[in-house]
């Protein structure tokens, strides 16, 4: 019987990888009307949380709010599957407030799979993609194609391990830790993308054959222990404190299930001694592995080596679900051999008799340095090829989801022949992250941080809808129902702000003495509620207590009005800085400027600016390693020099 090639399926967009980036990318493209296929190695592990089963935290929660404001799904799934919610940094300013939810990892995965299966235009395929089909392959293969806009080739589809070819005009790679994945326990290793799942073959070589540079990164996850074997009654309990708060701006999706507590223990002298005696058995300290791991999520051995002066480290015991006894030992990832891990766990108070269900392990994997991407997350070498998530060198479900949405959006717009969307740094943490990724030569897993943004007071979680939902509606990501909800909320917010600016409280009013005591300042005659809120220590909750704010008013409206009023001066100044930086983009820089002596610039920026010698701010902003914070510092320095020069010339006269 003569051989016949299998029929080729055609899609508009193909997404490779079913993690948090891949799911957001596929859902976004499908909702924009594109026929979309999502390929994954295991349909039973869709949107899996292989490390910490949690969503949110500092800067990460802002990302989740932003993804939701643009129509993404990570926020509402985190809300629906939350086991516990807490507000972090609550004692600090609103720029760094962060919602964090402990989630039921299996329920989260099931709900995401159901959502994908119910989405029109979206097909799911379980297969290993090992190759890329292109026209104009720089290596000399493929069909002839005339290069355009700097691209050396154009994507036409993907090829699977068993030889099937699927055609598409755009392909989004979201392969996580699976490209060349190798997991390590002590000095033992095996090919795997994560424990129990095979690594992906072929794609790294396919990318390299197209001229892409690849490298290796590392991450790790701690052991899981049986809850029933832990003496929880001996440990500090950490209950939920934010069951009434949500990531999603859509109140019709809010679900508050029964909350579960986490618990806290600490390392001991025995913990530290056992680690110090066996450091050479770990992949990093033993020299078996040299890939860079995440700076902000170090292993327990890294903590003990780097912070040798600390005699104890806090460890959190977090549930993985309502229907499983598995406990995630946060802050205790390790590269020690499995035979030592149980002994190590049993040095922790409350875990003296614990049962280890899964050992800790490290995983190193191939990634694509993101300087090879444009801000749309399309690769510079191959038109129609996009990448997102850990493949771009990031760490975290939230970072992955945000990139997935951007890549899916721009893949869809490419197919439609529409202009690519770039998210400016000053408009969102999404923009901040992507700007960092594509402009900086990063050699360790990237995590979003509030300190990475120069505009964090403006880029808060509570106002993510105000910043991004109008754009989402314009792009077709937000439907009419969500748009109506948004408009109603904004009307209520503006009405409340106006009321607070107009309504006054007199010194003779019954509530005045208590409010004066709260602030330590007298009310002279009368004062508007807005000016009262501007006083330190006064919050909308205090006004509710005295009948000055409607307790039935939505929390988002109450807090939004309070923040806008209380921080109005700071917000105006930060917006002025943003506007000034935009205006200054064409400002010329002196040819003889000595960047080495500008101490407010980062060391990297001083070196890069000296080497390049940009003519203006626009050129300076394109130099990898020169951040927007550096540009702001340079602008301030130039203004100070200008004032000093003017002052000196005036004095001379």
Swiss-Prot record:
Positions bound to NAD(+): 293-307
Record's keyword terms, sorted: Cytoplasm, FAD, Flavoprotein, NAD, tRNA processing
Disulfide pattern: none
Cofactor annotation: FAD
Biological-process GO terms, alphabetical: tRNA methylation; tRNA wobble uridine modification
Protein location: Cytoplasm
Source superkingdom: Bacteria
PROSITE patterns in alphabetical order: GIDA_1, GIDA_2
InterPro entries: FAD/NAD-bd_sf, GIDA_C_N, MnmG, MnmG-rel, MnmG-rel_CS, MnmG_C, MnmG_C_subdom, MnmG_C_subdom_sf
Residues bound to FAD: 17-22
Any GO molecular function: flavin adenine dinucleotide binding
Cellular component terms (Gene Ontology): cytoplasm
Record function comment: NAD-binding protein involved in the addition of a carboxymethylaminomethyl (cmnm) group at the wobble position (U34) of certain tRNAs, forming tRNA-cmnm(5)s(2)U34.
Subunit structure as annotated in this protein's UniProt entry: Homodimer. Heterotetramer of two MnmE and two MnmG subunits.
Stated family: Belongs to the MnmG family.
Protein name: tRNA uridine 5-carboxymethylaminomethyl modification enzyme MnmG
Organism expressing this protein natively: Prochlorococcus marinus (strain MIT 9303)
Organism placement in taxonomy: Bacteria, Bacillati, Cyanobacteriota, Cyanophyceae, Synechococcales
């Amino acid at each position: 019987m003569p051989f016949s090639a299998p029929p080729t399926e055609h899609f508009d967009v193909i997404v490779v990888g079913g993690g948090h980036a891949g799911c957001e990318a596929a859902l976004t493209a499908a909702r924009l009307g594109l026929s979309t296929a999502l390929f994954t190695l295991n349909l039973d592990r869709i949107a899996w949380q292989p490390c910490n089963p949690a969503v949110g935290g500092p800067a990460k929660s802002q990302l989740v709010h932003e993804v939701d404001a643009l129509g993404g799904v990570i926020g509402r799934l985190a809300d629906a599957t939350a086991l516990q919610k807490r507000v972090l940094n609550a004692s600090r300013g609103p720029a760094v407030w962060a919602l964090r939810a402990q989630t039921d990892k299996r329920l989260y995965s099931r709900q995401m799979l159901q959502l994908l299966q119910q989405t029109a235009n979206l097909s799911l395929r379980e297969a290993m993609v090992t190759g890329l089909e292109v026209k104009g392959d720089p290596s000399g293969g493929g069909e002839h194609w005339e290069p355009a806009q700097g691209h050396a080739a154009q994507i036409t589809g993907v090829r699977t391990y068993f030889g099937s070819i699927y055609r598409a005009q755009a392909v989004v790679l979201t392969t996580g830790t699976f490209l060349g994945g190798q997991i390590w326990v002590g000095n033992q290793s095996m090919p795997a993308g994560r424990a129990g799942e095979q690594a992906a073959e072929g794609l790294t070589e396919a990318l390299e054959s197209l001229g892409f540079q690849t490298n290796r990164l590392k991450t790790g996850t701690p052991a899981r222990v049986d809850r029933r074997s832990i003496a929880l009654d001996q440990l500090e309990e950490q209950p939920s404190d934010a069951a009434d708060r949500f990531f999603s701006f859509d109140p019709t999706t809010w679900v508050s299930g029964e909350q579960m507590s986490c618990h806290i223990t600490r390392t001991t002298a025995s913990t530290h001694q056992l680690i110090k005696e066996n450091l050479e058995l770990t992949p990093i300290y033993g020299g078996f592995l040299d890939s860079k791991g995440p700076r902000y999520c170090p292993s327990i051995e890294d903590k003990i080596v780097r912070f040798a002066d600390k005699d104890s480290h806090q460890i959190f015991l977090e549930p993985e679900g309502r229907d499983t006894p598995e406990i995630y030992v946060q802050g205790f990832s390790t590269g020690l051999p499995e035979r030592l891990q149980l002994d190590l766990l049993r040095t922790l108070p409350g875990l003296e008799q614990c049962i280890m269900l899964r050992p800790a392990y490290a995983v190193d994997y191939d990634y694509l340095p993101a300087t090879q991407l444009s801000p749309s997350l399309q690769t510079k070498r191959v038109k129609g090829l996009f990448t997102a998530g850990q493949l771009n060198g990031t760490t975290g479900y939230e970072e992955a989801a945000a990139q997935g949405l951007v890549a899916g959006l721009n893949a869809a717009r490419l197919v439609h022949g529409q202009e690519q969307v770039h998210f400016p740094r000053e408009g969102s943490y999404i923009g901040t992250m992507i700007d960092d990724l594509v402009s900086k030569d990063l050699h360790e897993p990237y995590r979003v941080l509030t300190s990475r943004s120069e505009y964090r007071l403006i880029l808060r979680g509570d106002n993510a809808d105000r910043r991004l939902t109008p754009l989402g509606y314009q792009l077709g990501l937000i439907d009419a129902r969500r748009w109506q909800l948004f408009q109603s909320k904004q009307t209520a917010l503006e009405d409340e702000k106006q009321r607070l600016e107009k309504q006054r409280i007199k010194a003779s009013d019954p509530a005045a003495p208590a409010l004066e005591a709260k602030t330590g300042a007298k009310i002279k005659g009368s004062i508007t509620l807005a000016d009262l809120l501007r006083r330190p220590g006064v919050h909308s909750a205090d006004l509710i207590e005295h009948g000055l704010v409607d307790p039935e008013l939505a929390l988002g409206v109450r807090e939004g009005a309070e923040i806008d009023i209380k921080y109005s001066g700071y917000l105006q100044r930060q917006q002025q800085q943003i506007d000034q930086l935009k205006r200054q983009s064409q400002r010329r820089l002196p040819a003889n400027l000595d960047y080495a002596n500008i101490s407010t610039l980062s060391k990297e920026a001083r070196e890069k600016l000296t080497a390049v010698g940009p003519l203006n701010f626009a050129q300076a902003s394109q130099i990898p390693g020169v951040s927007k914070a550096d540009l702001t510092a340079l602008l301030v320095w130039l203004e100070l020099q200008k004032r000093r020069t003017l002052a000196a010339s005036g004095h001379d006269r």
